[in-house]
Structure formats: structure tokens, C-alpha cells
Amino acid sequence: MAKMLRVGKITNTHGIKGDLKVLPLTDYFERFEELEWVYIEGFKDKFYIENIKYKPTLVILSFEGYGDINLVEKFKDRYLLIDESQRRILPEDTYYIADIIGLDVFTVKDEYIGKVVDIIQTGSSEVYVIRMNNLKEIMIPSVKEFMPEISLEKKRITIDPIEGMIE
């Protein structure tokens, strides 16, 4: 089976006509308009998107054939998934979170630091959480000054930390 990517989390129902509140896991809410269908975590079938509405922090979705709250209750707290073929092409130096998590991190002197275990969205930029061999976690801002190279092909990130950043 193709690698599945999370694009949203169903947080609750909305009204009685089968609408679902979805917390997008993307900066580009309109992304859902590009999708004809999605998977729902734990279900094998494709769910065809019938209607999309936007709230400031949520997307309201409905699926074909699911026009009743009783049919969609079971979807609460599950992730919306797409397969890799539905991925958007991202601009240069922009990455999917799923592609960054798990990458090895080295300094510019080729010293192994650890693995990326999480990414925190701060508004202006992202902060990568790196778990070191001693299980200590450090945070490195995802800016060129501290992160001169991200290579998905090599499955590694090169950082140029300032004094005290990785201690």
C-alpha cells in the first residue's frame, strides 16, 4: 500500500447533516479543494468530498452518501489521509513534515547530533525538535543560518549551531 499522509484531523461533527469539523494539518487550507477524495484512518474505503466550507481555524467537510450525523459520528478523532500520488508539489526549500521527521542531524563538522522527532509551528518559522543519543531533546530553528542543508535524498539535515545551542 502507498505511504499515507495526514492532511487533517476530524475533531467533531457540525450540525445534523453529516458535516465534519476538520483541523487542517497544512498551512494551505484550500488544499482540500484540490482533493476529490480522502481516506479516513481506520477505514479502507475512499470518501468522496461533497462540500467544503471554511472557518478561521477549521475546514467543514461533508462526504457523498454521508448526509446524516448518525453516519459520521464514528469518524470523530480520526485523521484524514491521502496517498502520495495526491501530494502537492511544494516550492523549493519547503518540505512535508512527514518527510522531515526521522531525518538524521549532523553538524557542519559532520558530528552526529540525533534525529528529528517533532516540528513545532511557531508562526514565523518552524522549530525542529531533535532527540540526541542521550535522549535529551534540543530545538533548532528551521532557518538557513542554523540549518544550511536539508537533504531528503541523503536523509539528513546539516546544522550550524551557535555556542550553547546543542548542550
From Swiss-Prot:
Signal peptide: none annotated. An accessory protein needed during the final step in the assembly of 30S ribosomal subunit, possibly for assembly of the head region. Essential for efficient processing of 16S rRNA. May be needed both before and after RbfA during the maturation of 16S rRNA. It has affinity for free ribosomal 30S subunits but not for 70S ribosomes. The PRC barrel domain binds ribosomal protein uS19. One of its GO terms (biological process) is ribosomal small subunit biogenesis. This is Ribosome maturation factor RimM. InterPro entries: PRC-brl_dom (IPR027275), PRC_barrel-like_sf (IPR011033), RimM (IPR011961), RimM_N (IPR002676), RimM_N_sf (IPR036976), Transl_B-barrel_sf (IPR009000). It is found in: Cytoplasm. Belongs to the RimM family. The keyword Cytoplasm applies. It comes from the Bacteria. GO terms for cellular component: cytoplasm; ribosome. Residues 92-165 form the PRC barrel domain. GO terms for molecular function: ribosome binding. Keywords: Chaperone, Cytoplasm, Ribosome biogenesis, rRNA processing. Binds ribosomal protein uS19. Disulfide bonds: none annotated.
